[in-house]
Amino acid sequence: MVSSLKDMLKYDEGEKLEMYKDTEGNYTIGIGHLITKNKDKNEAIKILEGEIGHTVKLNSKKEPEISSSESESLFEKDKSVAINSIENSSTLSTIYNNLDSNRKMALANMVFQMGASNVSKFKKSLKLIEEKKWAEAAIELKNSTWNTQTPKRSNRVISVFETGTLKEYK
């Protein structure tokens, strides 16, 4: 049962303790933690080692791997960055602060995935969300490139905006 932003993001992002390339080809680990957009694996490992504070262990497949607690630590930092970027956004902060807790999680999920500056470009959708016109906002969000690129995830998030419930997160 999803009851927190962490649960929601873990559902959408998954949690992989082994370094991998995301859909954009970027080195990622943990709960959707972007290590770098640099395509050089050795550079990604160096960055990751700086983030976790020690040499990365290699698993049996000789791939860099972190512990569950390191994944948790990276996630907490990423979550703080996402929430702080919402709070520091002139476009998003007022909208976010006037949402119920489930819809706050939905907006934070979008920011976690795309960044506050990209979410701020959803002008029509954000206006409809601000006006609490949930059905219209859902239609607008469904017509986005975001929905085309990650339809399963975006449809779950859109459902939260539309219904105010977490029923799509089972």
UniProtKB/Swiss-Prot annotation:
Its EC number is 3.2.1.17. The keyword Transmembrane does not apply. InterPro entries: Glyco_hydro_24, Lysozyme-like_dom_sf, Lysozyme_dom_sf, Phage_lysozyme-like, T4-type_lysozyme. GO terms for molecular function: lysozyme activity. PANTHER family: T4-TYPE LYSOZYME 1-RELATED (PTHR37406:SF1). Belongs to the glycosyl hydrolase 24 family. This is Probable T4-type lysozyme 2. It comes from Dictyostelium discoideum.
